[in-house]
Amino acid sequence: MRAEGADHSMINLSVQQVLSLWAHGTVLRNLTEMWYWIFLWALFSSLFVHGAAGVLMFVMLQRHRQGRVISIIAVSIGFLASVTGAMITSAAVAGIYRVAGKNMAPLEALVWGVGQTVLTLIISFSRILATL
């Protein structure tokens, strides 16, 4: 899918291109493009982490009568919360880059997106350990 920007340049919004890092030598110039690339990396890294946690919960609670349902609900709520936060923080990062007049390399979008997931993991574990 391609969207046309205000300066009549084409913005590439292909999920396959973002995830395969095809865009060697290109830069992300528009706010939409920066937000989309950062958000997709945050989305898929969060999906990977929550998928692994869900499988672990499902295996550990398989003999529990309501364990499967509880694990699905917990993983779903955690994933939706992290994706909502990723939308907001991706827009903030892209906005800062845009206001500063900087272009973003595709690898920077990867670092920002996966970095959001890593920070979410660190904050989540520190909050859990504080309650024990």
Curated annotation (Swiss-Prot):
The keyword Kinase does not apply. Its main location: membrane. The chain crosses the membrane at residues 38-58, 69-89, 105-125. The keyword Cell membrane applies. InterPro entries: Transmembrane_pr_170 (IPR019334). One of its GO terms (biological process) is negative regulation of canonical Wnt signaling pathway. GO terms for cellular component: plasma membrane. This is Transmembrane protein 170B. It is found in: Cell membrane. It comes from Mus musculus. Interacts with CTNNB1. Belongs to the TMEM170 family. Keywords: Cell membrane, Glycoprotein, Membrane, Transmembrane, Transmembrane helix. It is a multi-pass membrane protein. Glycans are attached at N12. Residues 59-68, 126-132 are cytoplasmic. Residues 1-37, 90-104 are extracellular.
